């Protein structure tokens, strides 16, 4: 994942490219299997229409892997270009003197406005980290809920507006929390989940992977998971709609 970023940074430094540097929008989703995405062969229809549309317009990797399988170390591998045992972020703890430049540092150095929404504390070696904008607070002063698809569009619009005000191209990292638990409808402390996916799957329609047995509880859990995948896709749809509405879509990678 780091190689395209390094190529982009190299282009940004190049004088001939300096006047037409593209904006950068980096999206992640959390705890989602590749085979939950329609374009990558999901057996359940309609899980990811927005991701599928984006993929149809994009370069796709058929054989991509992460170097470490949990959250904060994985994200810091991506943003450092170093293995966990080299970047010092091997768990969920602060590394005050990592000794390497973060992706956001590199982008700021070449003139980008950097912003992040979601997973802020997991996306850098220590907190607070020097992003130009933390987009977890909405323009109305309310803290954005990590499962609210609409808020991701609002945050994206806010980040783009802040970059325009700074007269810089933007580099926004937008981290969607779904389908990480708690799944859709699993509200901590009980109550009704107000952030309803655009499609809710039934236990009777979900495919059962070969490593699980067909059991009512398994089906119910998978139905909640796939509904949360759909909500993650709703978030992606809101983000991409905000990008299009900003007029910056054609200038953004």
Role assignments for model-derived ranges:
Residues 2-3, 15-253:
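Formylglycine-dependent sulfatase
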Residues 5-10:
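Sec-dependent signal peptide hydrophobic core
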């Amino acid at each position: 994942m780091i190689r395209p970023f390094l190529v982009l940074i190299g282009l940004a430094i190049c004088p001939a490219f300096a006047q037409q540097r593209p904006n950068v929008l980096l999206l992640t989703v959390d705890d989602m299997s590749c085979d939950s995405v329609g374009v990558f062969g999901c057996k359940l229809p309609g899980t990811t229409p927005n991701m599928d549309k984006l993929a149809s317009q994009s370069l796709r990797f058929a054989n991509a892997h992460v170097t470490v399988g949990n959250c904060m170390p994985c994200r810091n591998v991506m943003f450092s270009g170093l293995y966990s045992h080299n970047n010092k972020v091997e768990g969920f703890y602060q590394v005050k003197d990592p000794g390497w430049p973060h992706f956001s540092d590199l982008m700021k150095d070449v003139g980008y406005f950097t912003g992040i929404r979601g997973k802020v504390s997991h996306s850098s070696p220590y907190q607070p980290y020097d992003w130009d904008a933390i987009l977890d607070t909405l323009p109305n002063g309310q803290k954005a809920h990590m499962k609210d698809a609409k808020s991701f569009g609002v945050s994206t619009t806010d980040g783009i507006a802040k970059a325009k005000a700074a007269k810089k191209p933007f580099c926004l990292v937008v981290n969607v929390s779904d389908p990480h638990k708690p799944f859709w409808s699993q509200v901590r402390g009980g109550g009704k989940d107000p952030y309803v996916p655009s499609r809710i799957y039934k236990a009777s329609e979900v495919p059962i992977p070969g490593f699980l047995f067909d059991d009512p509880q398994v089906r119910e859990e998978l139905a909640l998971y796939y509904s949360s995948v759909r909500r993650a896709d709703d978030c992606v749809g809101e983000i991409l709609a905000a990008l299009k509405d900003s007029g910056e879509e054609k200038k953004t990678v």
